[in-house]
Amino acid sequence: MLSKIDINAINFCSLVFFITFVLLIINNNQTETLNMATIKPFRGIRPPKELVEKVESRPYDVLNSEEARAEAGDNEMSLYHIIKPEIDFPVGTSEYDACVYEKAAANFKKFKDNGWLVQDDKDHYYIYAQTMNGKTQYGLVVGAWVNDYMEGRIKKHELTRRDKEEDRMKHVRVNNANIEPVFFAYPDNATLNELIMRYAATNPEYDFIAPIDGFRHRFWIISDDADMKVITEEFAKMPSLYIADGHHRSAAAALVGAEKQKNNPNHTGDEEYNYFMAVCFQASQLTILDYNRVVKDLNGLSSQQFIDALKQNFDVEDKGKDIYKPTSLHNFSLYLDGKWYSLTAKEDTYDNTDPIGVLDVDISSRLILDNILGIKDLRSDKRIDFVGGLRGLEELKRRVDSGEMRMALALYPVTMQQIMDIADSGKIMPPKATWFEPKLRSGLIIHSLD
C-alpha cells in the first residue's frame, strides 16, 4: 500500500502538472491574441454635416500643387489648405519647404478654431461607403495598432521610398494627427458585414456626390458599445490586415507612432499615438482596375519584327480596329499601328506556384518590356509611361494615335487574392501593378495622436 507521504507526493505532482498545463493554455491564448489584429475606436475630428462638402477633398497624392490650387479656388475650408498647404504660397514654392509644413499645422489649428473641424466627444468606430457605377464598398474606420505594422501583421505588397516616408512623417509630426486615412483590406467576415448592413439601412451622417469623380460617399457613426465590442472582437480573430493603397502613409503613421513610444519615458501603450487611422474594407468588395503601359518606341524593331518576337511566348491574334480589352488573366491587349491584338501567354511562360511569376505585370515586364523592348526598370526608364484608373483603353489609343507613343499594352486587372497571396508570402508586387478605385476622400475624418 502507498504511504501517506507517497500519496501526498503524487497529489503534489498532479497539482504541479495541472497548474503547468493551465499556464501553457493561458500563454498560448495570449500568444494567439497578440498574433491577431488589434484595433480600437477613437474620437474622430470631423466637419459638421453642413460643411462636409466644403472641407472634403481628393487625397494628397493623386494631384499636383497646381491642380490642388485650382480645385481649392477661393474655398478657405478646403482640406487642400492642410494636405497641400503650398497652395497658400506663391506658385513654385516647394511642397517640401519647412514653412509649408508649418502652414499645414497653422491651417489645421485654424480649421478647429473656426469650427470647420470638431472632435467627437467619445470614441467611435465609423462606416465609410463609396458607390461607383452602382457598386458599393463599405469600410470600417478604425485605429490600427502601430505594433501590428512594425511586427508584420499589417501586410504590405509595395516597396516604399524613404524620402516619401519622411515627407509624410513630417506632416504627421507637425499636425500631431493622421489627417488622411490609409486603405486596408480584410478577409470577408459575415458578422461584420451584417453589422455594417444594419447601419447602412439608416440615415447617414454624410451623403454627397464628390466633384470630379462623381462617386457617392456616405458616412455613419457607430456609437453603440455592444456593436463596437463586436467589431473589436471580430478583428481580433484576423491574423492579418492588408494595405491596399497608401503604403507611404501607413509607414509614416506607424513610424511616427513608434518614435513617440521610444521618446516617451512614461509610455504605457494606451496612448492614442499607438494607433493610426485606417479604413478597412472586405476584400471581395474592392475594385481593382487595369494599370496599363504605353511605350515610346519598339527598340529599333519594325512592327512586323516586334509581332514576330511576341509570337515566341504569346499566341497573337489580330483583332482589327475595334478596341479589344483583355478577357482573362494572362491575356493582354496590344495597340500598334491603328490595330488591336490579343496576346495570350503560353503556359510554359509562367509558374502557377510562384505568386510573383504568375502575375500579368511580371509576365509582360519579363517577356515584352525587358526581353524585346529593353526596358529594365519601370520606375526610371523614360521610354515608358503608365495609364491607370478610369481613363480606359480610349486613352491608350489616343496617346498612340497622337504620335506621342508607339505602342500600348493593356493588362487584365490584378485580383485582391493575388495581392493577399503576395503579401502573405512576404514578397513585393512589381511596380505599377495596382490601381484601386474609388479613392478615399480626405477630410471626412481625422485622427488626433493626443
Predicted regions and their residues:
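Surface-exposed, charge/polar-rich loops and edge strands
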Residues: N35-D450
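Short, Lys/Arg-enriched N-terminal segments with co-localized hydrophobic residues
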Residues: F17-N35
